[in-house]
């Protein structure tokens, strides 16, 4: 059975990933708060000890306003931690899927969705840090997969009104 390690499993995206994969794979996560306090050496040691086949890295500081007011925390979470996770993946031979953001783009130039050739021009600290994180991860681990996700939301459990689903 494949061993998958999920970072940020207590967060919005990570908790849903953990829920979906549990029971189908051997899934582990890091303790809550571990990434906020860890050093590069401690993170590398922990991930080498876990020795996963796959690392899913959705952990981030994603509140755009918070990142503007706390750029040092944003840099650590969105640039350094992904780089450290990529180093652990490189050392252990794990596959890496790291989450980035559509905030690396400047805006929609028409009705087409973004692709790999779209202009990158982040307009805020969060977007700049996510782009720098992407570049540093791919510089170290070119085979890593980076997912530029858009705004993630869920209705249940987050106080958002349920308006119903429309069938396709």
Where are these regions (language model features)?
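Conserved Rossmann-fold NAD(P)-dependent oxidoreductase catalytic core, especially the SDR/UDP-sugar
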Residues: 83-121
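Glycine-rich NAD(P)-binding loop of the Rossmann-fold in SDR/ketoreductase-type enzymes
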Residues: 69, 73-84, 120, 124, ...
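NAD(P)-dependent short-chain dehydrogenase/reductase
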Residues: 138-168
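SDR active-site strand-loop-helix element
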Residues: 7, 55-59, 96-102, 147-149
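Conserved catalytic-core motifs of eukaryotic protein kinase domains, centered on the activation segment
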Residues: 65-72, 107-111, 158
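NAD(P)H-binding glycine-rich loop region in Rossmannoid oxidoreductase-like domains
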Residues: 38-77, 88-90
């Amino acid at each position: 059975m494949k061993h998958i390690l999920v970072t940020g499993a207590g967060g919005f995206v990570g908790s849903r990933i953990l829920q979906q994969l549990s029971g189908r794979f051997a899934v582990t996560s890091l303790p809550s708060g571990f990434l906020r306090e860890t050093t590069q050496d401690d993170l590398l040691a922990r991930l080498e000890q876990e020795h996963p086949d796959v690392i899913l890295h959705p952990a981030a500081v994603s509140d755009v306003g918070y990142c503007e007011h706390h750029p040092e925390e944003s840099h650590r979470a969105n640039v350094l931690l992904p780089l450290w996770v990529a180093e652990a993946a490189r050392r252990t031979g794990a596959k890496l899927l790291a989450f980035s953001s559509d905030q690396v783009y400047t805006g929609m130039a028409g009705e087409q969705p973004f692709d790999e050739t779209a202009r990158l021009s982040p307009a805020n600290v969060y977007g700049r840090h996510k782009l720098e994180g992407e570049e540093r991860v791919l510089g170290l681990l070119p085979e890593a997969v980076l997912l530029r996700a858009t705004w993630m939301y869920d209705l249940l459990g987050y106080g958002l009104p349920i308006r119903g689903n429309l069938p396709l």
